[in-house]
């Protein structure tokens, strides 16, 4: 089983969107039993809060079920438990490395790396552009699915 943890700053917009999109993609491909998918934050600011209404609206518009979720913070234990820890931007990656004590097992990636880009997924909390975030998340998740498919 491939274990994936999507991570963003607050765990209410981008990482929850990626969790829902990736879950949808693996279910659509009949691979749900081969993947364990979750999400977390690097900060404590939104702990306990649900998925942002903008993320919910965009996912519903795309026909993607929203995974019920309450924001949690990434821990060192998560680094040990997951195969892939996927951050949304450079700041997330830096904070993930701080939480995990570096990346000795090379498990930390930026999502758009899987779409052939080193760019950040813009945070719709600030941009208000959930459409652009969705396009990036979908591209990254599709690329990650191809990598995962080769290992299941």
Which residue ranges define each predicted feature?
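Phosphate-binding/catalytic loops
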Residues: 84, 90-149
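Conserved active-site segments centered on acidic
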Residues: 1-81, 149
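Hydrophobic structural packing positions in well-ordered secondary structure
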Residues: 8, 59, 86-87, 137
């Amino acid at each position: 089983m491939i274990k994936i943890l999507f991570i963003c700053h607050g765990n209410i917009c981008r990482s929850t969107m990626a969790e829902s999109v990736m879950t949808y993609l693996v279910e659509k491909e009949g691979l749900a039993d081969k993947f364990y998918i979750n999400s977390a934050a690097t900060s404590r600011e939104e702990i306990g809060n649900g998925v942002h209404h903008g993320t919910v609206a965009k996912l519903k518009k795309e026909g993607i079920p929203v995974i019920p979720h309450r924001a949690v913070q990434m821990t060192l234990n998560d680094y040990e438990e997951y195969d892939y820890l996927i951050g949304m931007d450079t700041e997330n990656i830096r904070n993930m490395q701080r939480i995990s004590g570096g990346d000795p097992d090379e498990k930390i990636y930026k999502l758009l790396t899987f779409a052939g880009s080193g760019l950040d997924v813009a945070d719709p909390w600030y941009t208000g552009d959930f459409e652009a975030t969705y396009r990036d998340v979908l591209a990254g998740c599709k690329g990650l699915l191809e990598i995962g498919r080769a290992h299941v």
